[in-house]
Amino acid sequence: MYFDGYKDISILDITFDSGKAKGLSALLVRNRAFECVVVKDHALDIAHASFGGVGVSFISRNGLSYQKDTFPKSFEGGLLYTCGLDNVSNCVNGVYTHGTLHDTPAENVRYDVVDGTVYVSGYIATTGLFRHSLILHRKLCISCDGVTVIDRIENTRKVDADYCLLYHCNFGAPFLSDGGEVKVDYLTREGLTPLAKETQATASNIIFPIPNAEEVVYYHTVKDGRAEYVNRRLGIGVEITYDSDKLPYLLEWKSMAEDDYALGLESATTRFDTFRKTPINAKDTHEYIVNIKFNRFQVL
């Protein structure tokens, strides 16, 4: 769909018709320099994305899948992969890795253009018989330089509940490349694995892909709820901002492996090693806002 007065803005309602993604419903959104694929059947998460014609998101070799398999066979990455509300990582035994939210289709999906911004909205219901009833109301505000994610988690029952949440923002080649730099104004930085502990001093550095390189994860506590990645060779950067009081942990996932070359900047309600869910009172609502904004600067 094209909109009167906005020749550089379009929203195409698409369905994948081949391969593992066959049957997936999505929106192909273009707002001038920024393009992205919003997957309706994956909680309105964002798969492919580009800025100024440069691919910025990490998409794994799995690609998009309609049928869920084990996590290593299903995880596609994407600019935004929302983890929760029942699990992050493997913290809860018997629950799918990184939770079931991402694989829950959005309902009542709507979209429009107002004053040059594309708005996509819908809700994702995570419910269970004799269990919790949490509804995530999502609005995506897609501009010419990125997206603002506005989520409201509503506890619709008359009993208290709890949840966990992690915004898994993933960047890949060509945006991710040798010489790139992660910029975090951190109070503390801590490696999760033995290798990560050994390499904390170089956590910010992106290197050339290495065959079979081991992934590393670092925890950051930050001053101001902001993380950046810059590629000076391309003259493109990304800034992620959020409320660090609500999302107090920033995880940096770095895979310099040749075939799985990825960087994840992930704001979260909890760490993995000291996992704790966030309580929500009966009939209460919690709001989270995450901004993912790209920018250009002079190429060095």
Where are these regions (language model features)?
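C-terminal beta-strand-rich structural cap/linker in extracellular carbohydrate-active enzymes
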Residues: 212-216
